[in-house]
């Protein structure tokens, strides 16, 4: 497969190649094989990533940053859940994507906590909650592009306007804190070790 993709790049049929929905070890294996054999390597990863679904940060984001891979985000509003139309104590409104297809999988409690934090920020900027969710994504260094799934012209225009929203450092801190993932091993051990190493040595 990698040789076939390489042939397509070398012949000019495609400019860059990317992959989608793979584990970090699979991505790294493909990159390493391409490098070892002088083949065109993957340049991008297409993956699910939202303020309410940051699992990608455990393994894939560090890998992409290290290997200089761009991230193309799919379902940046978690299947419409982060548009703000669905309320914490109610079902998804009729006609919305979530009403007929409850996908992608998301921790709804975390999602609604994020929505609660995004609403006052959206009000302060005079924009929709959806724009804040997209602006947060666009602020992430690893994100190269966001694949939006608007159903109407109004939704499309609203989504596109998110590129003009500039979140302040305080706003980003609030959003990062409310959406932060709990550390799992080896993450908490690496953080602990990093703290020890960063501490200045003391002398008697």
Question: What are these model-derived regions, one by one?
Answer:
Residues 17, 45, 64, 71-74, ...:
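Conserved, mostly hydrophobic/aromatic
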Residues 1-59:
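Glycine/proline-rich, positively charged
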Residues 15, 40-43, 70, 130, ...:
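Short acidic/polar active-site loop segments enriched in Thr and Asp
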Residues 56-93, 128:
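Aromatic-lined glycan-binding groove of carbohydrate-active enzymes
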Residues 20-21, 75, 127, 146-149:
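Active-site-adjacent beta-strand anchor residues
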Residues 66, 90-124, 139-143, 153, ...:
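Terminal-tail/helix-coil boundary detector
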Residues 2-6, 27-31, 61, 115, ...:
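Generic structural signal for well-ordered alpha-helices
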Residues 23, 49-53, 75-82, 136, ...:
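Glycine-rich beta-alpha junction loops
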């Amino acid at each position: 497969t990698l040789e076939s993709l390489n042939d397509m790049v070398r012949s000019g049929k495609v400019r860059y190649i990317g992959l989608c929905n793979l584990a970090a070890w699979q991505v790294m294996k493909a990159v390493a094989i391409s490098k070892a054999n002088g083949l065109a390597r993957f340049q991008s990863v297409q993956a699910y990533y939202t303020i309410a679904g940051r699992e990608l940060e455990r393994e894939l984001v560090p890998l992409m940053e290290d290997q200089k891979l761009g991230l193309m985000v799919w379902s940046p509003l978690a299947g419409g859940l982060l548009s703000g139309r669905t309320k914490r104590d109610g079902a998804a409104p009729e006609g919305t994507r979530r009403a007929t297809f409850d996908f992608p999988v998301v921790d709804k409690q975390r999602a609604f906590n994020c929505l609660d934090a995004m609403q006052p920020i959206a009000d302060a900027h005079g924009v929709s909650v959806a724009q804040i969710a997209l602006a947060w994504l666009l602020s992430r260094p690893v994100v190269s592009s966001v694949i939006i799934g608007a159903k109407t012209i109004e939704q499309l225009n609203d989504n596109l306007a998110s590129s003009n929203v500039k979140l302040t450092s305080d706003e980003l801190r609030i959003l990062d804190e409310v959406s932060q993932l709990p550390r799992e091993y080896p993450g908490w051990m690496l953080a602990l070790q990093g703290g020890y190493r960063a501490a200045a040595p003391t002398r008697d």
